[in-house]
């Protein structure tokens, strides 16, 4: 591993469209890995592109660039199509769980099953869980079986994972200043529902959420970009 290697990951709910069409809007940021939600199934997949979903027009995808490749991790029985476990190989190797929670799986409540099914996978020392969770502490009362705050606590206690945005900015869940979605593309209906959970002891160099004006014509979500610094072991 290269000393002080910077790893850049972007998660973005692209609100439909092809991977090729949507990815070109992110290329200028030179991401090592992109986690997409709501993108169409590509004609071909490779070790740089993995897609999963039960609707060919809307799925979750992991795209790598440069020296990085993505390998599908073994699936546990009854894994929802919109959770995609991937092994990232390259200058930095890690486990990645791509997430897009769905209404028909009770949104954040479906994460409880993923935590149970993929406990060993998520316990890898270099693990990232990223995507559109459709959840926030402000809606905990709507999910009494398993709410956002429970998920955050589980990630912290069991897997040593924290939200990069909250850790970098010293902000509590539910007190976010930067929305990641503008419901119906309305600037007055902003919510923070997209997250990138990273190891608590990792060095978070930067966390950036796209500007509303720059992205409003492309999606109701804004990309969340995270830079992590990895030192050689």
Please report, for each region that a protein language model flagged, where it lies by residue.
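Conserved beta strand-loop-helix elements of the APE1-like EEP
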Residues: 55-71, 88-89, 175, 182-205, ...
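Structured beta-strand-rich core segments of catalytic domains in phosphoester-bond hydrolases
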Residues: 37-106
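N-terminal, active-site-proximal structural segment of metallo-dependent hydrolase catalytic domains
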Residues: 1-47, 57-60, 231-233
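Surface polyanion/phosphate-binding segment centered on an Asp-His-Pro turn
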Residues: 217-233
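Surface-exposed cleft-lining segments at the edges of enzyme active sites
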Residues: 97-111, 137-142
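Active-site metal-binding loops of divalent metal-dependent hydrolases
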Residues: 14, 39, 101, 133, ...
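Metal-dependent phosphoesterases centered on the DNase I-like endonuclease/exonuclease/phosphatase
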Residues: 112-193
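Active-site environment of divalent metal-dependent phosphoester hydrolases
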Residues: 16-21, 39-44, 104-105, 136-138, ...
